[in-house]
């Protein structure tokens, strides 16, 4: 059986038909809150059940509970606050019980039923979520650029958020049907924001060995400068899957969600989201969702000990490297040879090669994947 949604029920908050038309008209008369791409993605993810059991943006009780205990106020595991920030003007013009229109790029996308408006302490927030308030951390910097009040309450989506990669996107309702159709009972999900190298392939295939299917689910959306652009990641995975994966054992879909770079907490968040898609297992990488040296390499593994009730099984697959003596990709558990035989695949090293227009060697990256990446004039975010 694919996993049950987090909290037991898949949330759906999308207006349809006549109701939708009426709400779009009404939204034009409401106080409106303009949101950026990341918040528009959060709206869609709430509405389509990616963030089940959340039905909107967090009210104070849930928000503080998540910061302090990594659980919602009903004790369900949840590690990343899903919040809507607004300025003083909105605060003055809105009361609890009001309806507010959420606008993205000049178009109303949702209506929020305001339950609470409250100030937040950004310092406390960053220390809890990121374990640092250092402004060099991209997630911290983003928080300090946000507005001073939070609006909490349930929402209903009233028009689609444009998605440039629509043909690659499946919502939880759809992946659950897909996994059932394929007859998969055990599904391993893989989260990524990178183009695939042989280390990723090794980890994915190790997970696939003892599950029925692999769900590759890269994030698209805001990333820090130096990360790969979305279309490069998608095309690179298409090439890898086409040439090196058994088609009936892999499902591929993109997820529009911002990277927070919150390390251990974000690893748990990524697992919960994939549970909502129907995955039963989640591959947790070394320094998962980390950035710089803010988190220890295996901190993202340790945090899962706090959540025996998570409802999705974390898979801690050791980092793979190429061993010249073994003649292939291995990990520390199965390779007896000393360090001088081991070639570790570092993302930094790979990015540097690609930046210089060099083709990575075949023990690092499949030639078909390298071909795709090098075909882009500029594969990186700036």
From Swiss-Prot:
Gene3D superfamilies: HUPs, Sulfate adenylyltransferase. It holds the Pfam family PUA_2. It catalyses: sulfate + ATP + H(+) = adenosine 5'-phosphosulfate + diphosphate. GO terms for biological process: hydrogen sulfide biosynthetic process; sulfate assimilation. Keywords: ATP-binding, Nucleotide-binding, Nucleotidyltransferase, Transferase. Its EC number is 2.7.7.4. InterPro entries: ATP-Sase_PUA-like_dom, PUA-like_sf, Rossmann-like_a/b/a_fold, SO4_adenylyltransferase_pro, Sulfurylase_cat_dom, Sulphate_adenylyltransferase. Belongs to the sulfate adenylyltransferase family. NCBIfam families: PRK04149.1, sopT. This is Sulfate adenylyltransferase. The gene is sat.
